[in-house]
Amino acid sequence: MAQGSPATVAACAFCGARRTRSGMVLSTSAADGYLDDEAQFETALRLLPAADQAAVRRRRAGRAVVLASRLLRTLGCAVHTGCAPALLAFDYSRAGKPYLRSRPAPAFSVSRSDCIAVIYVREGGAVGADLASVAECLSWAPDEILQLHDVFSAAELGRLRAAAPGRARAELFAYYWSLKEAYGKFRGTGLAGDLRLADMGELDPLRRGELRTLRRTLQGKHVCLSSRWHDAGHVLSLCEAREPSPTEEICLHKVPMEEVVRLCRPSLGMEKCHVR
């Protein structure tokens, strides 16, 4: 991993490649089988603080992806700050949004969908990230999406209604949903409040290989939302207040679960950080 201050070095903190975007996205999958091994699961779990271990154990379903998301949160912040993973201290706002108590403290946002976890981390200002699943939408009744009047504006529902039922509508829904939830995380409220106020308007489907940036004024605040396909079944959206340049790409690294665990071990040589 490349080290150095992400505020002054125009290189990805994870791979060292030059970049135009100041943040990075890491993702991992709990479906690769690594955490299916009980011994490996327990070894990975012990890398978390006791409170986080207890939170994972309380889960009746989806424990592996919850563990993956907590470890990825640690790894993303450790790589970005240069702090040793074991020295990072996290807390939660009243609304449940996690933040880093250690200093330096970048902005970050974590999302998980199906068996995949992602983190977006960068310097300066609030951020929101969301990963939305197409398969989850396909499991619903054909017209169930069109009944979500408390989620979508009239313009958004009209666009969803015009999409062909099935895969096409599910993909457009995933795009809209990822935008709304990324915006909610950016605000620190998640899905609380009137989601219709996060009106994205009439959108075309997100194309494969496309990086699309929207500029919106939502609830009196100017925001930029960037979206791309993470894989064939998930849309990734990021929300922030900054204005991206036309050439900026999302620096996305898909990290195998075994590598996430290895990099979160105490032996990882990074600098110390300060905790409030």
UniProtKB/Swiss-Prot annotation:
One of its GO terms (cellular component) is cytosol. One of its GO terms (molecular function) is holo-[acyl-carrier-protein] synthase activity. InterPro entries: 4-PPantetheinyl_Trfase_dom, 4-PPantetheinyl_Trfase_dom_sf, P-Pant_transferase_sf. It comes from the Eukaryota. Its EC number is 2.7.8.7. GO terms for biological process: lysine biosynthetic process via aminoadipic acid. It catalyses: apo-[ACP] + CoA = holo-[ACP] + adenosine 3',5'-bisphosphate + H(+). Keywords: Transferase. It holds the Pfam family ACPS. Belongs to the P-Pant transferase superfamily. AcpS family. Catalyzes the transfer of a 4'-phosphopantetheine moiety from coenzyme A to a serine residue of acceptor proteins, such as alpha-aminoadipate reductase. Necessary for alpha-aminoadipate reductase activity. This is L-aminoadipate-semialdehyde dehydrogenase-phosphopantetheinyl transferase. The gene is LYS5.
